[in-house]
Swiss-Prot record:
Residues 427-438 form the EGF-like domain. It comes from Bitis arietans. Gene3D superfamilies: Aldolase class I. One of its GO terms (cellular component) is extracellular region. Expressed by the venom gland. Residues 1-23 form the signal peptide. Its EC number is 3.2.1.35. It comes from the Eukaryota. This is Hyaluronidase-2. It catalyses: Random hydrolysis of (1->4)-linkages between N-acetyl-beta-D-glucosamine and D-glucuronate residues in hyaluronate.
Amino acid sequence: MYHLWIKCLAAWIFLKRCNGVHAMPAKAPMYPNEPFIVLWNAPTTQCPLRYKVDLDLKTFHIVANANDSLSGSVVAIFYPNHLGVYPHIDERGHFFHGIIPQNESLTKHLNKSKSDINRMIPLKTFHGLGVIDWENWRPQWDRNWGSKNVYRNRSIQFAKKLHPELSEDKIKRLAKKEYEKAAKSFMRDTLLLAEEMRPNGYWGYYLYPDCQNYDYKTKGDQYTGKCPDIEMSRNDQLLWLWRDSTALFPNVYLEIILRSSDNALKFVHHRLKESMRIASMAREDYALPVFVYARPFYAYTFEPLTQEDLVTTVGETAAMGAAGIVFWGSMQYASTVDSCQKVKTYMNGPLGRYIVNVTTAAKICSHALCRKNGRCVRKHSDSNAFLHLFPESFRIMVHANATEKKAIVKGKLELKDLIYLRKNFMCQCYQGWKGLYCEEYSIKDIRKI
């Protein structure tokens, strides 16, 4: 009965969005008057400090931690060995903390997590992204396939050791029940602890929600990009996680096989669509902010995204109504002076200019359509409308002097531009505002803030 209610709720929200109506307001943006932001979450500290290569992130409207570090006051990412005593098996087969969640003390984990959060985020007024990156196992038994099947096997062994008198069938059912209960407790209680300690942060788990639409390698031209129904249903069953999250962190990493292809857009679009669906069903008062993880280079390579794929990732993310995009990267970006220079060159070329284009266009649309009280979202999520600067009305220039370099946008919105925006986009009002153009105070929403 509970699962049926969730499905009905999800279907109602989906119909609302398809009809171009936002049933819920959005949380106010992370920074005032910045409806769509781009953040940097790559370990590039060595570029400015060791190699004296400034990546010019600030120049192109990218928000980053101090010294371009991986974790800080803007984005704090917690890997398995950074937060508590996370039970798991690593990629090399090493065992940690009882391997499975039901074989480790939750109290011990939370006590250690508390000290880890204080160490990594000393500022109690932390207002950044708190991203917990636990990818070794999934909280749902049926999603632990492939290499993650080891957690099911270990759980069965654990249950059999405690209850040798039970039949194989009962052992498997008990193992599943105990595993899911413990996994839920680990994930939920960790999240609630983090939110209690740093209540102004945006907390959630990396790669949640997922869509499992990775079959582009086998489907070829038959690939639709759609999330399998079973995976959407499983996401519905994680309502407990969405309710306790204060942000969502899906990813849209592109492999090189998708370069400049129709399949790339299908892959990204449906992952975003599922994330926005989950964001709208998580709470009663506002849709969760979605910060989408992307890579400026193709996954597992050091080859920059094409202009077309920048539109596919950054452009699609903004047009679908996400709060921002987070660029993640590997140590390779800062491994040598040449690597740093390659990132800088890309930043000063297509990447930086496109980021300025989209972030500025999102701001202009928010001003023109939503009176700065909401963000622009496609009226029809499957359309090909993007939040881009109108080339006949605006131009991007980079000004540099002895002390700073800054990208500046010059121009003004023309009537024909406004007509285009009104035709293709609608306002998702921030909490406290309502109306077609977010022009009215909403006393009901203000009381909830």
